[in-house]
Every structure is written in C-alpha cells, then in structure tokens.
C-alpha cells in the first residue's frame, strides 16, 4: 500500500479548486485553498482557506509549510513561487519540471517535436520580421502568448506581422502556429500516480466558442478506433516522459484519421467535467487520489453518453431563479454552479446530462443552459 498524504494544499481559488472540495470531504482529506479573496469560488466553500496571492512566494511557502502535498487550480504560478514552495519540502504534484509544459507553450511544442508527436507546424517568433517570414509560407497564422493564456486570451489569428506587435513588444517572444482546419477538437485525459500507475478516461469531443470551451460529449461520438488509440498513446507518452502526477489533459485537433496536439493541462480540465456525473470516478476525485498517493478509481462511463454544457455569463444576473426552472424542466440534469459573479461570457457553471441518445441529450442540456443563463427564457 502506498503512503497517503492527508493534508492537501491547492494553489488558486477558482472553480477547479471548488470542485475538489466535495471529493476531498468524501475521502476525508483536509483541503486548504490558497485564494486571493474570501469571495473566490473555492474560498466560499472550502473548510480551510489561506488568503494570499498564488503569485506571492511568501503566501505559497506558508501553504507548503502547512500541508503534506500541494497541487494546482491553475498552472500559471511564477517560478519564484514554485522555488519557494520546493524549499518547504512538501510534495508538489504535478512536479514543477512537468508543470513547465503546461505553463510554457514553446517548451510544450519543443517537447512534442522531440517525442515525434504531431503538432501544427510552429515557429518561435522573436521579431516582426520572423513573423512576416512565417506568414509568407502560410498566409494566416495563429499567434499565441508563450505564458499566461487561458480561455482563448492570448490566442490571435493574424494575416500581417504588425497585428502581433503589441504582444511582441510586451513579451519579446511568441509562438506562431499554422491554422489547423480540424474536423473537430478532442480531449484525452489520463490520471497518473507518483508510482506511474495510469488510468485513461474515454476520449471526448469538445466544442470551443471564441476560444472558450462550450460543450463536451463523452465519449466522442463515432470516434475511429485508431484515433482513440492514438489519443491515449499520446497522453500516456507525455505523462510518462515528464512525470505528471494527477490529471493530464491533452487538447487535440482531429483531422480525418489523424490527431494533432493543441496544448496540455496538468490539473482537472473543462473537457473532463462530464466525469463528475458520467463516470464511476470523477476527475476531481481522481486528481486528489493521485496526488494523495491513493489508488486510482475506475474511469468507466455510467451511461452510453454524457453531454456537458458550460454556463457562460449572459443576461441573467441571479442564476438561482434560472436554475430552479432548469431543474424543473430537465429533472435528469446535474447542475454545478461556481458561486461566481455573472459577467459577460464568464464561465459561471456547467450542466451534465447522461443517457442514450446524443441528439436528445444535447437538446435538453442546451434547454437547461438557456433557462439558467438567459433572462425570460421559457421552458
Ligand atoms: N493552430 C490552431 N489552429 C486552429 N485553431 C486553433 C489553433 N490553436 C488554437 N486554436 C483554437 O483556439 C482555441 C484556444 O487555443 P488554446 O487552447 O491554445 O488557448 P488557451 O487560451 O490556452 O485555451 P485554454 O482555455 O484551453 O487554456 C483552441 O481550442 C482552438 O479552437
Ligand atoms: Mg486550450
């Protein structure tokens, strides 16, 4: 039997940390969240909260000194803070050497190239002239900030080099990629323990709107066996090579029978929210099991399909009124609200719906979504 860590610290107080709170209680793990503000999503519900910035080495050190293992709600923790954390001697999962590949998109592209895993064609851009040269080959490119991007922030399509001048002046270096005309986007998730045991989740179909995850279907309908196999192989190869501990998500573009890696995340991921209600072991519980050194859980889906739809801030400010309508209209829907103030297009929750018929599940999940986020929507 492995040694289990009981006291878990989470850096960041967003919705991902919040969704760890329930599973932590079930497993009798003591979760402490480091959050900026007591009103942050996870800070509202965690039994133990430390107030401080995840970017502040002192605050991170304090967290590390009070727990057995530290994990993350988001990966954008500065290197100084990670170094301070390492000095406390607590376990850090995923380890900073692995986390790098989720923090730095250039390091990630270099790693994938080394592992001979297909990526979009990519360029390291340090000057406007380099971008202009790359544009001569492709006409249009996706330019990305190397660090700090999320939900499509830090991703821009450009046709002329000038369009990236502001980012280049600020960051000095950017990643440019060819535009992949994909059939659809996929998400592959694997959980890995410190001892290297791994469990895969079914590969899912993801749909992004304005660079932001909007809908997920698990498993990806009609996925060719070869594509699913390759998605799992890629996730396993990356997890093993860099020593991930916890959940790894690999965002993929499917083009016919081929897949290209978009990016990596080393934490529970939006593409796995379906598993909270649709799989034997949800991704938040699985992440905690892995970082706590507990055996991993079964990842099998309960139903033929689960559809997850994100609730993005719209016209309704008080979501509870809409939630009551949705729960009445679609009794099978599982609702997850993040306790966040509603702002335009902000992720404020999600719904899950499991069953047999994907078309019906999609319709009903969107019905619930609209009732929750839009003022005056009728059943
Ligand atoms: N090379 C590409 N070709 C085509 N579309 C792309 C490409 N890169 C990104 N996109 C689109 O933009 C979305 C966001 O890109 P990416 O995942 O790199 O950004 P992010 O802001 O880091 O996202 P996340 O919210 O997942 O952290 C992708 O899901 C995809 O829809
Ligand atoms: Mg992404």
Name these PLM-found stretches.
Residues 94-155, 161:
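A conserved helix-loop-beta module that forms one wall/lid of the active-site cleft
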Residues 154-256:
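Internal nucleotide-binding/catalytic subdomain
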Residues 229-250, 255, 265-314:
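Active-site "cap" helix and flanking loop/linker of ATP-utilizing ligase/carboxylase catalytic domains
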Residues 121, 140-143, 173-177, 248-249, ...:
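A short linear hydrophobic-aromatic micro-motif
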Residues 1-110, 129:
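ATP-binding N-terminal substructure of ATP-dependent carboxylate-amine bond-forming enzymes
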Residues 4, 289-379:
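Peripheral (often C-terminal) accessory segments that flank ATP-dependent C-N-forming ligase machineries
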């Amino acid at each position: 039997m492995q040694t289990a860590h009981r006291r878990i610290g989470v850096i960041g107080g967003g919705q991902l940390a919040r969704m760890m709170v329930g599973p932590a209680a079930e497993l009798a793990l003591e979760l402490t969240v480091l959050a900026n503000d007591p009103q942050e999503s996870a800070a509202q519900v965690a039994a133990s909260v430390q107030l401080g910035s995840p970017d502040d080495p002192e605050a991170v050190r304090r967290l590390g000194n009070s727990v057995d293992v530290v994990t993350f709600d988001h990966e954008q923790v500065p290197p100084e803070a990670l170094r301070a954390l390492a000095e406390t001697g607590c376990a850090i999962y995923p380890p900073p050497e692995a986390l790098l590949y989720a923090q730095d998109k250039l390091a990630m592209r270099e790693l994938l190239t080394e592992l001979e895993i297909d990526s979009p064609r990519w360029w390291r851009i340090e000057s406007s002239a380099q971008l202009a040269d790359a544009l001569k080959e492709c006409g249009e490119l996706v330019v990305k900030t190397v660090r700090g991007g999320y939900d499509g922030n830090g991703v821009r399509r450009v046709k002329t080099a000038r369009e990236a001048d502001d980012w280049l002046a600020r960051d000095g270096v950017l990643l440019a990629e060819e535009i992949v005309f994909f059939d659809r986007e996929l998400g592959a998730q694997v959980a890995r323990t410190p001892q290297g045991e791994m469990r895969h989740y079914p590969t899912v179909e993801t749909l992004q709107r304005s660079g932001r995850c909007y809908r997920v279907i698990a498993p990806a309908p009609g996925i060719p066996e070869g594509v699913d196999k390759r998605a799992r192989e890629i996730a396993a190869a990356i997890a093993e090579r860099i020593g991930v501990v916890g959940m790894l998500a690999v965002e993929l573009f499917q083009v016919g029978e081929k897949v290209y890696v978009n990016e990596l995340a080393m934490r529970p991921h939006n593409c796995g929210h379906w598993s909270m209600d649709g799989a034997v072991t949800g991704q938040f519980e699985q992440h905690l099991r892995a970082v706590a050194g507990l055996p991993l859980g079964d990842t099998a889906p309960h139903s033929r399909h689960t559809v997850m739809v994100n609730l993005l801030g719209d016209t309704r400010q008080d979501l509870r009124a809409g939630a009551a309508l949705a729960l009445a209209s679609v009794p099978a829907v599982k609702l997850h609200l993040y306790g966040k103030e509603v702002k335009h297009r902000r992720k404020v929750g999600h719904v899950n719906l499991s069953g047999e018929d994907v078309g019906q599940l999609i319709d009903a999940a969107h019905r619930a979504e609209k009732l929750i986020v839009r003022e005056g929507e009728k059943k």
